[in-house]
Amino acid sequence: MIPRYTRPEMASIWEPQTRFKIWFEIEAHAADAQAELGVIPKEAAKTIWAKARDATFNIDRIDEIERETKHDVIAFTTHLAEIVGPEARFVHQGMTSSDVLDTCFNVQLTRAADLLIADIDKVLAALKKRAFEHKMTPTIGRSHGIHAEPVTFGLKLAYAYAEFSRARERLIAARKEVATCAISGAVGTFAQIDPRVEEHVAKAMGLMPEPISTQVIPRDRHAMYFATLGVIASSVERLATEIRHLQRTEVLEAEEFFSEGQKGSSAMPHKRNPVLSENLTGLARMVRAYAMPAMENVVLWHERDISHSSAERMIGPDATVTLDFALNRLAGLIEKLLIYPANMQKNLDRLGGLVHSQRLLMALTQKGASREDAYRFVQRNAMPVWRGEGDFQTLLKKDPDVKKFMTDAEIGELFDLGYHFKHVDTIFKRVFGAS
């Protein structure tokens, strides 16, 4: 988590003060439940809240204690005792460190997911707006990077909209997966604490009780969460890569907004590079990389070890902060994307009508030619055009084999660009709904 790629809204979730505040709330809510069950005095639970609810925890002091104890939760509860006083002896009754750490981690992950869902909504709004602006803007579709058949630029953006809609649903599911709480004691048996304490804390923290924990919440939940972030990052990169290709000088169908005073190169003043898209490509690699340790964290020894801990202290903040930044950058990129319909049309025309070859093939078979013959007739006229030697429609009209099946007028009708877009409305309704 470095400032260059960090937004304050997401960073605040992972700040030490936020973490200690959540730790306190977990401990205090547990004390409330213990008090209701008669395990600790009710006045003690009230005092814990009264003394520390609005406290600013002394991070330097906690660090000082941890240097001696070598244990972060003990360092925190020791500092909490300094704030609360004698009633602090009722804090952490029957609990283990993982109850606090894991429940806190899941609170942070769910809060991060809420921000990421809002980020995706920004991307979706930008994509929808630009898709409708260019719903019928003709452009060339490419397979293997080579001209294939016409599409519209609106369809390109609609593809991305559908992908990010799926990403949103996956993230909602991943949020639910980690929205669990464990207050079950040393090895998850509730030997020293009533399960009703867990139920109370879970409700208070906006979580669900973990059905069965060991000393930790099972890490397959977290693996799914971080894998989902990795998939979303891949969707970010897919769209960024599309923009990078479209901005190449010889293509130039779309271009990142270039602001006044912006410089593209320290050496070449003419340069306008797709730096935002390239940046997103690199950030996506990092988010995907964080999914790997999350997968490996699933494999813990027996009821618990802490091999997961060091990894999670890094991947939790880094993955969510990085993806949050990337999604917001992507939304802004799409909102300001420069789109060049004239260049799209010029590129459509570059191959002299070859983009209609499949329609010619189908028409010939419908007129009685075998598919093999029709393919041969069309291809032998297409190849000279591919080499820049003539116009496709003109060559077809001179081909005696083609003329056996079709008139010049019938051939000409097959070069209608609008034919390829007759179902755009249907696709848009599928993607965006009837509205």
Where are these regions (language model features)?
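A structural signal for small-residue-enriched, beta-sheet-centric alpha/beta enzyme cores
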Residues: T189, P209-V216, Q345, L361, ...
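Short amphipathic alpha-helical segments with heptad-repeat character
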Residues: T110-D121, K128, A158-Y161, S165, ...
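Generic, well-ordered alpha-helical scaffold segments in large soluble proteins
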Residues: H29, A33, H79, I83, ...
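Catalytic-core signal marking the mid-to-C-terminal active-site face
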Residues: M1-T18, A55, E68, A75, ...
